[in-house]
């Protein structure tokens, strides 16, 4: 008799995705981040759902409703801090997942990679709108500054901005629509995740060597299910430690001051996970140029497959490319640091140098070094 998991219309989809899925035998821990992102998304949707039951999206009561959640709702403080720090864990896993894709050449699966870029944009939009909801000082001014960038778009910028605001400034209608979109987007993200997995399972997973692994496959369960569960435990332990010991470590103290349109905080900055892009935005003295650089800092991932000039897929056996990759990582850390600093000397020039290097490495140095490595292979 055939097992029900292989015949049942619903169970066989789950079976072919998580049980009998053939997987390369050499996958390292860098392949854990996909499943960790799934757990992060689940945690965010669950905690967000319970928070939404107590939150009110009105400028008069939003800040107080968050205070009420933390003080009066059973384990409301836990829900709030799990949700806020869960977003940080989400982005840590996201950036490591993208970094893994860049290092091991996973971007050659173009459909999976492009859906991944769409997912990155969707998650960033969700996180930005979520940061506005507590209606603290940094929420309000962050929303004002970032949405204001749309006014740099020629001809339609100002009209588009007022349409998004629902008025002439960030106000009640802006908060209400941001809450609606913040609630809706995670479900769109979930649908995109399914498409991402669909395309991934069409080709099968890449592996650290970058060499086709068809002759050497193992079933996903029990080998990688156990490995993923270990990853869950490590990540959830880190999240629990952050939430229970230092919940405000990654937040901004200004957000504990209710939003006031009449006083501007000394340093307006987004959450830490957007600082690298914010630093690139601030490095360009022109408004439209800054906005284009900001968008391109993420969208540049879409042209990485076109710029792949190496004869090898993975960087595992390419030491020169590895040096450039880790230099790129160092530059991203530098940009993240600069994004949190005030706009003054020497931070301005450091930010501009790092921004130029970021684009140069991806667009010019990496393809060039790959060609040099191809030449060295002939020796």
Curated annotation (Swiss-Prot):
The keyword Lipoprotein does not apply. The gene is MT-CYB. Heme 1 (or BL or b562) is low-potential and absorbs at about 562 nm, and heme 2 (or BH or b566) is high-potential and absorbs at about 566 nm. Heme b b566 binds at residues 97, 196. Belongs to the cytochrome b family. GO terms for cellular component: mitochondrial inner membrane; respiratory chain complex III. CDD domains: cytochrome_b_C, Cytochrome_b_N. Its cofactor is heme b. GO terms for biological process: mitochondrial electron transport, ubiquinol to cytochrome c. A ubiquinone binds at residue 201. It is a multi-pass membrane protein. GO terms for molecular function: metal ion binding; ubiquinol-cytochrome-c reductase activity. The cytochrome bc1 complex contains 11 subunits: 3 respiratory subunits (MT-CYB, CYC1 and UQCRFS1), 2 core proteins (UQCRC1 and UQCRC2) and 6 low-molecular weight proteins (UQCRH/QCR6, UQCRB/QCR7, UQCRQ/QCR8, UQCR10/QCR9, UQCR11/QCR10 and a cleavage product of UQCRFS1). This cytochrome bc1 complex then forms a dimer. Its main location: mitochondrion. This is Cytochrome b. Binds 2 heme b groups non-covalently. The keyword Electron transport applies. Heme b b562 binds at residues 83, 182. Component of the ubiquinol-cytochrome c reductase complex (complex III or cytochrome b-c1 complex) that is part of the mitochondrial respiratory chain. The b-c1 complex mediates electron transfer from ubiquinol to cytochrome c. Contributes to the generation of a proton gradient across the mitochondrial membrane that is then used for ATP synthesis. The chain crosses the membrane at residues 33-53, 77-98, 113-133, 178-198, 226-246, 288-308, 320-340, 347-367. It is found in: Mitochondrion inner membrane. InterPro entries: Cyt_b/b6_C (IPR005798), Cyt_b/b6_C_sf (IPR036150), Cyt_b/b6_N (IPR005797), Cytb/b6-like_sf (IPR027387), Cytochrome_b (IPR030689), Cytochrome_b_C_euk/bac (IPR048260), Cytochrome_b_N_euk/bac (IPR048259), Di-haem_cyt_TM (IPR016174). Keywords: Electron transport, Heme, Iron, Membrane, Metal-binding, Mitochondrion, Mitochondrion inner membrane, Respiratory chain, Transmembrane, Transmembrane helix, Transport, Ubiquinone.
């Amino acid at each position: 008799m055939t097992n029900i998991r292989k015949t049942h219309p619903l169970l066989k989809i789950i079976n072919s995705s998580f049980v009998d899925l053939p997987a390369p035998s050499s996958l390292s821990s860098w392949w854990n981040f996909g499943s960790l992102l799934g757990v992060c998304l689940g945690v965010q949707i669950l905690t967000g759902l319970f928070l939404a039951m107590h939150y009110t999206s009105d400028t008069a009561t939003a800040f107080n409703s968050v205070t009420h959640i933390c003080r009066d709702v059973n384990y409301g403080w836990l829900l709030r801090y799990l949700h806020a720090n869960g977003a940080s864990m989400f982005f840590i896993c996201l950036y490591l997942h993208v970094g893994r894709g860049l290092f091991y050449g996973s971007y050659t699966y173009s459909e999976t990679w492009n859906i991944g870029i769409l997912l990155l944009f969707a998650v960033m939009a969700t996180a930005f709108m979520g940061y506005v909801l507590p209606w603290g000082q940094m929420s309000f001014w962050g929303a004002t500054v970032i949405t204001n960038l749309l006014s740099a778009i020629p001809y339609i910028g100002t009209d588009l901005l007022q349409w998004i605001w629902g008025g002439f400034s960030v106000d009640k209608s802006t908060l209400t629509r941001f809450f609606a979109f913040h609630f809706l987007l995670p479900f769109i993200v979930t649908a995109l995740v399914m498409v991402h997995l669909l395309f991934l399972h069409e080709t099968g997973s890449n592996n650290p060597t970058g060499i086709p692994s068809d002759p050497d496959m193992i079933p996903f369960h029990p080998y990688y299910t156990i490995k993923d569960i270990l990853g869950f435990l490590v990540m959830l332990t880190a999240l629990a430690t952050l939430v229970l010991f230092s919940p405000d470590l990654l937040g901004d103290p200004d957000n504990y001051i209710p939003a006031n349109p009449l006083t501007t905080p000394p340093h307006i900055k987004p959450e830490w996970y957007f600082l690298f892009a914010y630093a690139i935005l601030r490095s360009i003295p022109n408004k439209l140029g800054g906005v284009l650089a900001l968008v391109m800092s993420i969208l540049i991932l879409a042209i990485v497959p076109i710029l792949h000039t190496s004869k090898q897929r993975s960087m595992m056996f390419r030491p020169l490319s590895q040096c450039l990759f880790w230099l790129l990582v160092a530059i991203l850390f530098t940009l993240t640091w600069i994004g949190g600093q005030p706009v003054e000397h020497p931070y301005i020039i450091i930010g501009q140098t790092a921004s130029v290097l970021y684009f140069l490495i991806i667009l010019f140095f990496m393809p060039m070094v790959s060609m040099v490595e191809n030449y060295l292979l002939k020796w």
